[in-house]
A protein has these predicted regions:
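Hydrophobic alpha-helical connector segments
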Residues: 1-16
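Short loop-to-helix capping motifs
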Residues: 13, 26-27
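Secondary-structure edge/capping motif, primarily at the C-terminal ends of alpha-helices
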Residues: 17-24, 56, 81-89
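Short, hydrophobic secondary-structure boundary micro-motifs
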Residues: 18-20, 33, 60-61, 120
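Residue-level recognition of alpha-helical structural elements
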Residues: 30, 63-67, 90-97
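Amphipathic alpha-helical packing segments from all-alpha helical-bundle domains
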Residues: 30-57, 68-83, 102-110
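C-terminal peripheral helix-coil segments that are non-catalytic and often amphipathic
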Residues: 83-126
Length: 126
């Protein structure tokens, strides 16, 4: 699935992600590029969430900025999942990709409509 491909890409560049904060502090050009890319991602996720709501896969927001903050959680997990895995396991391996992909997948589940939950189960064979 797409998320697993993305997580494998993160793993491939783990040398960067394990020292993410340091890299951002020490390299203004990389930081500027990252922040620009992050703004584009926010727009893309907002458009995705709106499409999923329109297609009755996701529910409407119940709280102000609920989906903006959901995206923020995805961003935090995406940026720091490797650090978490490294701390918890003393080493990092491709096996951690499945576990953290599941963390990302399941983060969306509470926001799904019944139709969305049925589709989720179908897609991920839960």
């Amino acid at each position: 699935n797409t998320l697993e491909v993305i997580m494998k890409g993160f793993y491939h560049y783990r040398f960067l992600l394990l020292d993410f904060v340091h890299v951002m502090r020490e390299n203004p050009n990389i930081r500027a590029h990252y922040l620009e890319m992050e703004q584009r991602r926010k727009v893309q996720f907002d458009q995705l969430f709106q499409l999923l709501i329109k297609n009755e896969i996701m529910r409407e927001e119940a709280l102000p900025n609920e989906y903006k903050l959901l995206y923020k959680r995805f961003e935090i997990i995406g940026n720091f999942w490797m650090s978490s895995a490294q701390i918890e396991n003393d080493s990092l391996s491709p096996n951690h990709i499945d576990e953290y992909s599941l963390v990302m997948h399941q983060a969306i589940y509470p926001y799904l409509t019944q139709k969305g939950k049925e589709e989720y189960v179908r897609l991920f064979s839960v």
